[in-house]
Regions:
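Eukaryotic N-terminal low-complexity, Ser/Thr- and Lys/Arg-rich leader segments
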Residues: 1-2, 366
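N-terminal Rossmann-like or analogous alpha/beta NTP/dinucleotide-binding catalytic cores
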Residues: 2-150, 268, 314, 320, ...
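Functionally constrained cores in energy, signaling, and assembly domains
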Residues: 10, 28, 45, 75, ...
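Structured ligand/cofactor/substrate-binding pocket environments in proteins
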Residues: 16-25, 44-46, 51, 60-72, ...
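A short secondary-structure junction signal
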Residues: 120-123, 158, 216-217
């Protein structure tokens, strides 16, 4: 069975949080570990640290990007996407700016896409309008980033690209570029397929405010690197409902604590299907909705928040431990990233050479 290639990645703009974990990291961990009936790994997974793309709206803050790359590498190590043990399943993690072929591919692709087509991308369109509304302007690099993403995908001839619903137009544009190039020159490039999560709740995790998508900039995120004290404080800030008495019926809708219980239940079903909370949670919900009787402990908000803290902390404890281990072996991890980046460079340069040959740009050495 021929392995399929997966390309995914993150913009290094800060530490990763639970939104990243449930929205993409779990999927990556599963993909890199998946084996076929012959016990062979099914996928070669490439994870790109998209530092060049991060600069499209952070050009004045390049030091922020540099620092965030280091944080991102530690986060990847802490969840098992990077390993110093060659016998363990892991992904190929590389830094975008070190793959020079990507910039050259982007330049060629720009000649195959019209301005109006790029501006039809809903993400580009909405961001452009938002910047205008704020009295600012959008860098051309931001407008052109879907073409850069097409270069990333095609350089590694990715069969699958995990994306959220909002990134589907990017896959569509990539395949349009592939078709245009193959029809204009020679069939060198490969069409790709979007791999989307089936659970909308996981792909757009709400923050601790229960209202907006989890984000560092909105100050509503639970980071994978949060200490127990930080986590405890954030869980205690979560809203429940407006009941004034324990005996009054509570509501689940808009209740951030129960929202996170439901999210964490997805993790439990994946990795701890016999966890006691999976059995107890329906009872807690029923008592909460019906109103606690005789001051039942598990109908109290404080009890529920304590249990939620314990559950999220159970997820984060091994991640924190691996992160500390990563700090102690950071030089070896950086060497691993350098090795992976060189490997990625070879693949991208091979694709670039094929593309230039198809275009007639494979000039002899003068």
């Amino acid at each position: 069975m021929v392995k399929k290639t997966v390309l995914t990645g993150d913009r290094p703009t800060g530490k990763l949080h639970l939104g990243h974990y449930f929205g993409s990291l779990i999927n990556r961990i599963n993909l890199q570990s998946k084996k076929d009936s012959d016990n062979n790994y099914e996928y070669d997974q490439y994870i790109m640290i998209a530092d060049m793309q991060a600069l499209t709206d952070n050009a004045e803050y390049s030091s922020k990007i540099t620092n965030s790359v280091a944080e991102l590498i530690l986060d990847y190590y802490s969840v098992g996407l990077i390993s110093l043990d060659p016998t363990k399943s892991q992904s190929i993690v590389f830094i975008q700016s070190k793959i020079s072929a990507l910039s050259e591919l982007s330049m060629y692709y720009m000649n195959l896409v019209t301005e109006s087509r790029v501006l039809r991308n809903p993400t580009v369109k909405s961001e452009r309008e938002q910047k205008k509304w704020q009295g600012g302007s959008v860098p051309f690099g931001f407008l052109a980033y879907p073409i850069s993403q097409a270069a990333d995908i095609t350089a590694f001839k990715a069969d699958l690209v995990p994306v959220g619903e909002d990134q589907l137009p990017m896959i569509e544009l990539t395949n349009e570029i592939v078709d245009k190039f193959n029809n204009t020159y020679h069939p060198v490039l490969r069409r790709t397929t979007a791999l989307t999560t089936s659970d909308a709740k996981l792909s757009r995790l709400l923050g601790i405010d229960g209202e907006q998508k989890m984000s560092k900039s909105l100050n509503n995120a639970i980071f994978l690197s949060d200490s127990e004290q930080e986590l405890k404080s954030k869980v205690n800030k979560m809203k429940t409902c407006t009941r004034t008495s324990l005996n009054q019926p509570g509501t689940l809708e808009g209740n951030t604590v129960f929202y996170f219980f439901d999210v964490m239940s997805v993790w439990l079903n994946m990795y701890h299907p016999h966890h006691y909370i999976l059995q107890e949670l329906p009872k807690w919900k029923a008592r909460y909705v019906n109103g606690g009787q005789n001051n039942e402990e598990y109908a109290k908000d404080s009890f529920l928040k304590d249990k939620l803290f314990d559950l999220i902390n159970e997820l984060l404890i091994p991640i924190r431990q691996k992160r500390q281990e990563g700090l102690e072996h950071i030089s070896s991890i950086y060497k691993k990233i350098d090795f992976d980046t060189k490997k990625a460079n070879i693949i991208a340069n091979t694709t670039l050479h094929e593309l230039k040959c198809a275009m007639g740009l494979d000039y002899p050495n003068f």
